[in-house]
């Protein structure tokens, strides 16, 4: 199957997966799905925070190494991101809760797993070229949003917490939503020298999950405006990742564009 047909098919499959139902050992009415998801995320958001400093430091080291050594360590970066997505898929979306027993948020677990597998395939057949050439100034708009996601200044009650220590201990690196913006942003900064299937699948899943979080502000008890604001990096950068082929073609010479891979 050629690329022009394969990519839309993959995106449609991902969209279908995002609407899979949540499963729990204790049956529940579908109208309570948001409460079930809330129970899972409350538990999983704290379960692996002990790993956060390690992943924060590893990410910074990787970014410095990418800037210095570029595509020489491209496969290391691809593997790191792929492992993170597979980790998020299972660690963030499976929990044994007090109210519902073993619970699986399949609508997130399946598509994020697929994204992770695409990243692992990128390790095997790499197409991302981490060259970081000089870009027009407007293309760096993602950086403040990446910093916000990396910091994730929020406390357990979902209120603002601008403690600088969170630059080392926030949920970045152990939760999907604050970590994905950085990964997509990196791809946009090396575009067009990217694996387009990886960029599109990662961006689509990020955008849909980000938009579902927007809906949670209206239907999930305890979901705060600040938590919604902290999901704007995921929404904006994911949307940009999908639209960048349209936006950038108008701003760079056509001969510099790579074909889809």
Predicted regions and their residues:
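Alpha-helical transmembrane segments of multi-pass integral membrane proteins
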Residues: 10-22, 79-91, 107-125, 134-159, ...
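Juxtamembrane membrane-water interface segments of multi-pass membrane proteins
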Residues: 1-3, 32-34, 62-73, 123-136, ...
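Short aromatic-rich membrane-water interface segments that cap or initiate transmembrane helices
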Residues: 38-51, 163-180
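Non-cytosolic membrane-interface motifs at loop->transmembrane helix junctions
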Residues: 98-110, 132-135, 163-173, 223-233
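C-terminal transmembrane-bundle signature of multipass membrane proteins
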Residues: 19, 180-261
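Hydrophobic cores of alpha-helical transmembrane segments in multi-pass inner/ER membrane proteins
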Residues: 10-21, 49-64, 110-126, 176-190, ...
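Juxtamembrane "helix-exit" motif on the non-cytosolic side of transmembrane helices
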Residues: 25-29, 90-100, 152-164, 213-223
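N-terminal topogenic module of multi-pass integral membrane proteins
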Residues: 1-101
């Amino acid at each position: 199957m050629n690329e022009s047909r394969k990519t839309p098919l993959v995106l449609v499959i991902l969209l279908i997966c995002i609407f899979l139902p949540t499963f729990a050992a204790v049956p529940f009415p579908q109208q309570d799905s948001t409460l079930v998801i809330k129970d899972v995320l409350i538990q999983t958001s704290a379960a692996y925070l002990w790993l956060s400093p390690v992943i924060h430091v590893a990410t910074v080291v990787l970014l410095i190494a990418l800037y210095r050594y570029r595509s020489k360590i491209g496969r290391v970066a691809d593997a790191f991101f792929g492992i993170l997505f597979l980790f998020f898929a299972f660690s963030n979306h499976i929990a044994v809760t007090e109210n519902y027993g073993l619970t699986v948020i399949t609508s997130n677990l399946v598509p994020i797993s697929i994204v992770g597998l695409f990243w692992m395939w990128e390790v095997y057949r790499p197409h991302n070229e981490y060259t970081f050439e000089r870009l027009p100034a407007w293309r760096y708009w993602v950086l403040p949003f990446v910093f916000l996601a990396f910091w994730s200044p929020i406390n357990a009650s979902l209120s603002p917490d601008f403690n600088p220590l969170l630059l080392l201990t926030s949920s970045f690196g152990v939760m999907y939503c604050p970590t994905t913006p950085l990964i997509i942003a990196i791809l946009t900064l090396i575009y067009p020298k990217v694996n387009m299937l990886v960029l599109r699948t990662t961006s689509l899943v990020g955008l849909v999950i980000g938009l579902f979080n927007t809906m949670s502000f209206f239907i999930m008890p305890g979901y705060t405006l600040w938590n919604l604001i902290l999901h704007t990096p995921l929404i904006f950068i994911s949307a940009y990742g999908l639209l960048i082929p349209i936006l950038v073609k108008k701003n760079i010479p056509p001969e510099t564009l790579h074909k889809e891979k």
